């Protein structure tokens, strides 16, 4: 991500919410807007911060029992849009796609579900499609988007924000 660009919009969609509150608070303090899915959106709102539902942006509901939530051009276009390419910028303007500058996502606990002896049906539902797609899209556009793909990356992100956005006294 370019040094001078501030994060305006963060897509947050996580299974594990522990430790997320500190990140959300810091992002909110810096004026970052949140875009999220069901449970994560409710978590962010429970902290007292506004959060736009993915469904409001896409104008499409979560379908197939929650299997399809973020797989939409208005989400992936906002992540994959190359900010320095005029053609990309014209297209996102034409289709009213917001730039997404930060993606915070983690994957369903597939291995833990398998190890728990869960049923095949439960195991299959823990195969994450949207989460891994978001990670790959953000990684592909690493020049313009920051990706946080696990709880282990929350502290480094928080440290980065403290360095970038805290004025020396």
What are the language-model segments listed below?
Residues 2-36, 40-52:
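N-terminal glycine-/serine-/threonine-rich phosphate-binding loop
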Residues 165-169:
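Conserved small/polar residues in nucleotide/adenosyl-binding loops
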Residues 39-109:
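Glycine-rich nucleotide/cofactor/substrate-binding loop typically near the N-terminus or early
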Residues 105-125, 129, 133-164:
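A short, charged helix-loop
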Residues 22-23, 45-49, 56, 63-66, ...:
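Short acidic, glycine/serine/threonine-rich loops at helix termini
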